[in-house]
Curated annotation (Swiss-Prot):
<dbReference type="InterPro" id="IPR001646">
    <property type="entry name" value="5peptide_repeat"/>
</dbReference>
<keyword id="KW-0677">Repeat</keyword>
<protein>
    <recommendedName>
        <fullName>Uncharacterized protein slr1819</fullName>
    </recommendedName>
</protein>
<dbReference type="Pfam" id="PF00805">
    <property type="entry name" value="Pentapeptide"/>
</dbReference>
<feature type="domain" description="Pentapeptide repeat 7">
    <location>
        <begin position="271"/>
        <end position="310"/>
    </location>
</feature>
<feature type="domain" description="Pentapeptide repeat 3">
    <location>
        <begin position="100"/>
        <end position="139"/>
    </location>
</feature>
<feature type="domain" description="Pentapeptide repeat 6">
    <location>
        <begin position="231"/>
        <end position="270"/>
    </location>
</feature>
<feature type="domain" description="Pentapeptide repeat 2">
    <location>
        <begin position="60"/>
        <end position="99"/>
    </location>
</feature>
<feature type="domain" description="Pentapeptide repeat 5">
    <location>
        <begin position="191"/>
        <end position="230"/>
    </location>
</feature>
<feature type="domain" description="Pentapeptide repeat 1">
    <location>
        <begin position="20"/>
        <end position="59"/>
    </location>
</feature>
<feature type="domain" description="Pentapeptide repeat 4">
    <location>
        <begin position="151"/>
        <end position="190"/>
    </location>
</feature>
Length: 331
């Protein structure tokens, strides 16, 4: 079928085009709101600036299709093959992208507010500047998760997004807005979160081993039981964060703000806390074996039963701190 015929039939009131084979079709700027093209073959199609709001494209083949600037608000793309598709600047607000394959897709500056991305594969996709506020990527069951491995999400807006159990290993989230996002059980190994906004984010049981968090804002975040070993966390702001039972083994926390944190039973062995601010921090039973605490600020911190035995404490300030033996340091 030619593009002209399809558009004409749609204008005449026909909307059902299930399973049509239309590879390479040129439908640039066509108005096809609510069209049903589920299971259609649209490989390499030109859908630039197309109006596809509420369209049904479930299970459709859109490999390498051009959907730049297209309007797909509330469209159904569940199970669609979107590998290497170009969605640059597209509107996908409230769209259903469940179980879709978006490997290596371009989603730069895309509006994905409230989109359903559960079980979607976005590995290697580019989402720079995309807005994913309130998007749902929550892991439903074991082995069924959204894959964002090595995805590029620099400066993306993910505020309040539900990303529980998502695979973000090696992803670029530098300067991303993850304020109050649900990142519970998330795999962020070797991810780049430099200068990311993680204020109030939920990161319980998350794996951030080897991640870059330099300059990130983690104020009031919940990092309970998170694995952050061998990570880069220089100049991080963790003020007021919950970090009980966190693993920070061999992590570089030089110059970080850890004041008013709750770090009871934290593993800080071999961590570098040079010039870190731990004022008023709760560090009951924290483990500091071979940690570098040079010039760290522990003023009024609670270090009851903490292990400081082999730590380097040259120039550290423990004024007003409650020491491991329960005694308050007065000088």
């Amino acid at each position: 079928m030619e593009a002209k015929e399809l558009v004409q039939r749609y204008r005449n009131g026909e909307t059902l085009f299930t399973g049509l084979k239309l590879p390479g079709i040129n439908l640039e700027a066509a108005d096809l709101i609510g069209i049903v093209l589920n299971e259609a073959d649209l490989r390499g199609a030109n859908l630039l600036f197309c109006y596809l709001n509420r369209a049904n494209l479930g299970q459709a083949n859109l490999v390498a299709a051009n959907l730049s600037g297209a309007s797909l608000n509330q469209a159904d793309l569940a199970g669609a093959d979107l590998r290497s598709a170009n969605f640059h600047g597209a509107m996908l607000q409230g769209a259903i992208l469940r179980d879709s394959d978006m490997t290596l897709a371009t989603l730069q500056d895309t509006n994905l507010i409230g989109a359903d991305l559960r079980g979607a594969d976005l590995s290697g996709a580019t989402l720079t500047g995309a807005c994913l506020r309130g998007a749902n990527m929550r892991q439903e069951k074991k082995g069924y998760y959204t894959n964002l491995q090595a995805a590029i999400l620099g400066r993306a807006d993910l505020q309040g997004a539900n990303m529980k159990g998502v695979d973000l290993s090696r992803a670029d989230l530098s300067y991303a807005n993850l304020k109050e996002a649900n990142l519970r059980d998330v795999d962020l190994r070797k991810a780049d979160l430099s200068y990311a906004n993680l204020k109030g984010a939920l990161l319980t049981d998350a794996n951030l081993s080897g991640a870059k968090l330099n300059g990130a804002d983690l104020q009031n975040a919940n990092l309970m039981r998170a694995k952050i070993s061998e990570a880069e966390m220089t100049a991080v702001n963790c003020q007021g964060a919950i970090m009980t039972h966190v693993n920070l083994n061999r992590t570089n926390l030089t110059g970080s703000n850890l004041s008013f944190t709750r770090m009871n039973s934290a593993d800080l062995s071999r961590a570098n806390l040079t010039k870190a601010n731990l004022q008023e921090a709760e560090l009951i039973e924290a483990f500091f074996a071979r940690a570098n605490l040079t010039e760290a600020n522990f003023i009024n911190a609670n270090l009851v039963r903490a292990d400081l035995m082999s730590a380097n404490m040259v120039g550290a300030d423990f004024q007003g701190a409650t020491m491991p033996d329960g005694q308050v340091r007065h000088h």
